């Protein structure tokens, strides 16, 4: 009998293939496994987005196949208070937040972790995230997933070593095709289900339509940053993010040349969207950033200069940088090379090789 047989693991079952295979792998490792389906959003009956019922049915089918119990819990109130309201506040302020990071911080590794431990008597929780846990000197580290294309450590940088110590990430050691293959061999209901895309509470709905239901759009001018020439009208600053080139409606401007136009700045006070031509326009480039609301996985604040790499958005190549503490829970990050489309409100996440050190929210970008 495995040493794990006395250990109870609650797997966050999303109705997707990754959490399905995670439950199976933990069973194979000898753990006592149960599933938990979290409902984090109350849908409106009049929308087409009703995937929660399908996801729950898929999670139940997988649990039935594996012979494990599935619990359900409703965290919609916690989600609204701790994730969604902050998401709206950030958009109102002209920034671009990442609600998936907030959801992991407030729901999956806080509300879920507490519920699993206190109500279900769990020793661990597990999720289908593509990350790895590595314990060194009694502290748990967060490592990138083995599959570089699927690594999700960027979304989990707010976790502390204590939270990681209570979490298992079985698919983090695998590549995505291996996960699909296991699901197909087991004939799991989720084997061929496509990966979910988009923000969890919006699903496949059009983002602008969704946002307009909660924040009134305020149309305003689009100006060329080089000469203040009017280029058109935007429907609301909240619909645009730095570096965006699609959906501006200003293609083919007279005497405009061939290069595409990009969003390079937002003047929230005056409701102006600034654009420039070319993906290497100086106003699009940043030499660094200032970050706040810092989270370090080892819980040790930075006290000296640090050489490492940083990601300023998911699925982006690492940028070599120097991080300097400013005190007051802020840091300056200087890139070795200028980098495009650094976006306030998004997260900057730091790495030493495969180890995720932590990160913070981008407060401003440095343009010199």
Swiss-Prot record:
Residues 98-100 are annotated as: Interaction with target base in tRNA. Belongs to the MnmA/TRMU family. The keyword Heme does not apply. Catalyzes the 2-thiolation of uridine at the wobble position (U34) of tRNA(Lys), tRNA(Glu) and tRNA(Gln), leading to the formation of s(2)U34, the first step of tRNA-mnm(5)s(2)U34 synthesis. Sulfur is provided by IscS, via a sulfur-relay system. Binds ATP and its substrate tRNAs. The lineage of its organism: Bacteria, Pseudomonadati, Pseudomonadota, Gammaproteobacteria, Enterobacterales. It comes from Pectobacterium atrosepticum (strain SCRI 1043 / ATCC BAA-672). Its EC number is 2.8.1.13. It catalyses: S-sulfanyl-L-cysteinyl-[protein] + uridine(34) in tRNA + AH2 + ATP = 2-thiouridine(34) in tRNA + L-cysteinyl-[protein] + A + AMP + diphosphate + H(+). Disulfide bonds join 103-200. Its main location: cytoplasm. This is tRNA-specific 2-thiouridylase MnmA.
């Amino acid at each position: 009998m495995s040493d794990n047989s006395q250990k109870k693991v609650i797997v966050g079952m999303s109705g997707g293939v990754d959490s399905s295979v995670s439950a199976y792998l933990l069973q194979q490792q000898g753990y006592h496994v149960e599933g938990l389906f979290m409902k984090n959003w109350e849908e409106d009956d009049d929308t087409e987005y009703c995937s929660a019922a399908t996801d729950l049915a898929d999670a139940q089918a997988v649990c039935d196949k594996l012979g494990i119990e599935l619990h359900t819990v409703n965290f919609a109130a916690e989600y609204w208070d701790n994730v969604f309201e902050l998401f709206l506040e950030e958009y109102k302020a002209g920034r671009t937040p990442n609600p998936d990071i907030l959801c992991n911080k407030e729901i999956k590794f806080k509300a879920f972790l507490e519920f699993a431990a206190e109500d279900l008597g769990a020793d661990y929780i597990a999720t289908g995230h593509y990350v790895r846990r590595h314990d060194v000197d009694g502290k748990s580290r967060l490592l990138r997933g083995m599959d570089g294309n699927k690594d999700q450590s960027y979304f989990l940088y707010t976790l502390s070593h204590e939270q990681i110590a209570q979490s298992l990430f079985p698919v983090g050691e695998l590549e995505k095709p291996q996960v699909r293959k296991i699901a197909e061999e087991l004939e799991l209901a989720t084997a061929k289900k496509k990966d979910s895309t988009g923000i969890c509470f919006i699903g496949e709905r059009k983002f602008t339509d969704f946002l307009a239901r909660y924040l009134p759009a305020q149309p305003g001018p689009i100006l060329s940053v080089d000469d203040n020439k009017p280029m058109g009208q935007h429907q609301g600053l909240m619909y645009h993010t730095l570096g965006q080139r699609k959906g501006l409606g200003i293609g083919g401007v007279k005497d405009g040349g061939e290069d595409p136009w990009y969003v390079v700045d937002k003047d929230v006070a005056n409701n102006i969207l600034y654009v420039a031509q070319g993906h290497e326009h100086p106003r699009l480039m940043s030499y660094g950033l200032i970050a706040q609301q810092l989270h370090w996985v080892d819980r040790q604040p930075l006290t000296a200069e640090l050489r490492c790499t940083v990601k300023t958005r998911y699925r982006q190549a690492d940028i070599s940088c120097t991080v300097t503490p400013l005190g007051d829970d802020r840091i300056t990050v200087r890139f070795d090379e200028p980098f495009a489309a650094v976006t306030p409100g998004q997260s900057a996440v730091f790495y030493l090789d495969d180890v995720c050190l932590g990160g913070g929210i981008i407060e401003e970008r440095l343009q010199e």
